[in-house]
């Protein structure tokens, strides 16, 4: 999977950009604030329908403009697609695949599997469980065709149940929901557990390469006692849940935990080690997708040089090159990119929203 061409209009300081990319490495250099991260953000938005920088879309649309537009030409093996996304200032989103309206953001996300590596991405390891659930659910979204619909239904039922609890309704009013909720909770949790176990060998192999001095172990926790039937637990805990106003236990509390030499990684690893572990996890997940589904991820890496020494940068670049994936990397100077020791690709200079291709 690769983006061969990208058109960006009215997206932050990228007023009118039309670029052709290499299917391997694409390097973006320029001063801070020049627009390097904005280009990564535009690519991410095309594949997710949201930003990794701002939750308010109006801040992304160029000043005094009614909308922004993204268009990409996508290639995978012998197949080609055109994808487009337009975000209006009043909030509407229009998504197109091969010129056809009526597509959902999930359709774009399925077509464009992406892995994002940023300095803020350490929340995967030192943030709350929701970040690690999202990590698992990303993989399941691309591995199980029915996962997304089950996940949406599960969250809808949880929202309805929590609303009923906060309104102090009796158990008889929500019992019918709990039957379906329990069924979906077990299905989603089983999928998560299976995926976590399937991913374990790739994680251990990649961590051994990046952090050979540490023994990294992983464990999945489904959000309630493993031996307990979830429907029974909902009934048992109803009075407690009603008193609190929301459902305390369940798949919405699941976690995927990481330890280094038996201790939580967020307590014992340096920021550099945490970044290496984050990179290892993203690479392992991308490689697992390739092994299982024969699909390449697109890797977006912002501020490549931060927290990593020269040896680790070269090691990461080597693994990315071996993966055969398309990679977008930002850095301040071309010298930082030379340390990656990548012989081919494309180099772009970004200067206040203007992007020029240079000789690599």
Task: Put a short name on every predicted segment.
Residues 121-210, 221:
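An accessory alpha-helical subdomain
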Residues 48-131, 137-147, 200, 204-205, ...:
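Nucleotide-state sensing region of NTPase/ATPase domains
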Residues 302-304:
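Walker B catalytic acidic pair
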Residues 72, 326-332:
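Structural recognition of the conserved hydrophobic beta-strand(s) that form the central parallel beta-sheet
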Residues 36:
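Conserved lysine of the Walker
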Residues 1-31, 172-298, 307-311, 315-326, ...:
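Conserved NTPase motor "head" modules and their coupling/switch loops across ABC/AAA+ ATPases, GTPases
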Residues 45-57, 284-292:
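Post-Walker A helix-loop "phosphate-sensing" segment adjacent to the P-loop in P-loop NTPases
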């Amino acid at each position: 999977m690769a983006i061969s061409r990208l058109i960006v209009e009215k997206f932050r300081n990228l007023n009118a950009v039309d670029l052709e990319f290499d299917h391997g490495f694409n390097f973006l250099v320029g001063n801070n604030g020049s627009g390097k991260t904005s280009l990564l953000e535009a690519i991410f938005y095309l594949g997710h329908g949201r930003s990794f920088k701002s939750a308010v879309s109006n801040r992304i649309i160029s000043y005094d403009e009614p909308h922004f537009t993204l268009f990409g030409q996508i290639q995978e093996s012998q197949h080609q697609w055109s994808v487009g996304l337009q975000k209006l200032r009043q909030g509407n989103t229009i998504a197109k695949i091969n010129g056809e309206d009526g597509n959902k953001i999930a359709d774009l996300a399925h077509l464009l599997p992406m892995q994002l590596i940023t300095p803020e991405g350490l929340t995967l390891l030192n943030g709350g469980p929701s970040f690690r659930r999202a990590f698992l659910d990303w993989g399941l979204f691309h591995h199980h065709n029915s996962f997304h619909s089950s996940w949406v239904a599960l969250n809808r039922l949880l929202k309805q149940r929590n609303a009923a609890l906060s309104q102090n309704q009796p158990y008889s009013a929500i019992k019918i929901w709990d039957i379906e909720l329990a069924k979906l909770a077990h299905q989603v949790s089983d999928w998560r557990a299976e995926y976590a176990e399937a991913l374990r060998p790739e994680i251990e192999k990649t961590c051994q390469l990046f952090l050979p001095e540490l023994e990294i172990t992983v464990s999945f926790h489904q959000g309630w006692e493993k031996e307990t039937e979830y429907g029974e637990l909902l009934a048992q805990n109803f009075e407690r849940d009603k008193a609190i106003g929301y459902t305390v236990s369940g798949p919405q509390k699941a976690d995927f935990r990481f330890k280094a030499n038996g201790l939580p990684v967020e307590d014992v690893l340096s920021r550099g080690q945490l970044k290496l572990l984050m990179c290892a996890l993203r690479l392992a997940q991308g490689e697992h997708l390739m092994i299982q589904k024969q699909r390449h991820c697109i890797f977006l890496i912002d501020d490549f040089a931060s927290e990593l020494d020269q040896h680790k940068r070269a090691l990461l670049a080597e693994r990315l090159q071996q993966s055969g994936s398309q990679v977008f990397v930002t850095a301040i100077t071309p010298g930082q990119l030379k340390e990656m020791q990548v012989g081919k690709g494309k180099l772009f200079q970004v200067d206040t929203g203007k992007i020029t291709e240079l000789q690599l």
